[in-house]
């Protein structure tokens, strides 16, 4: 499948794969940030905040899966080592050192704002060049 995907996308496919791997790194870090935040959150609204964070963690994991599949379809290899996530990520990782619900939510909102910017730039770059990847990013 990788050969056909590369053929359809044409020149620039390696750059697209690199950007998808950077987005994949972001999704893995976002997954962990939501997941660990759901575990350590404290305060009177702990239960609903934990439930919301857990739901978002599942969404981020699904995004990572879709990105990895597309990278493979294009003939690339998804990032293989967790240490590469921090090196490649656009948005980084904010450890939930303050377990207060409001602080954890604020960290995650900042992460989502960064992801929106990354995906917006990727959409502009992909428009008219790679319809399949464009649609995937739009879905995410």
Where are these regions (language model features)?
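Disorder-to-helix initiation segments
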Residues: 2-23, 101
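Acidic/histidine-rich alpha-helical segments that form the ligand environment
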Residues: 19-26, 30-33, 37, 65, ...
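Conserved alpha-helical segments that form or flank metal/cofactor-binding pockets of metalloenzymes
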Residues: 30, 35-37, 41-84
């Amino acid at each position: 499948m990788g050969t056909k995907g590369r053929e359809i996308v044409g020149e620039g496919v390696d750059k697209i794969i690199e950007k998808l791997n950077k987005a994949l790194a972001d999704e893995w870090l976002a997954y962990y940030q939501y997941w660990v935040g759901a575990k350590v959150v404290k305060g009177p609204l702990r239960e609903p905040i934990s439930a919301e964070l857990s739901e978002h963690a599942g969404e981020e994991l699904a995004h990572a899966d879709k990105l990895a599949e597309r990278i493979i379809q294009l003939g690339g290899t998804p990032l293989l080592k967790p240490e590469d996530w921090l090196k490649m990520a656009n948005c980084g990782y904010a450890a939930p050192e303050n377990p207060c619900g409001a602080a954890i939510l604020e960290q995650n909102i900042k992460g989502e704002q960064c992801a929106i910017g990354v995906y917006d730039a990727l959409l502009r770059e992909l428009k008219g060049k790679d319809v399949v990847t464009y649609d995937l990013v739009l879905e995410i």
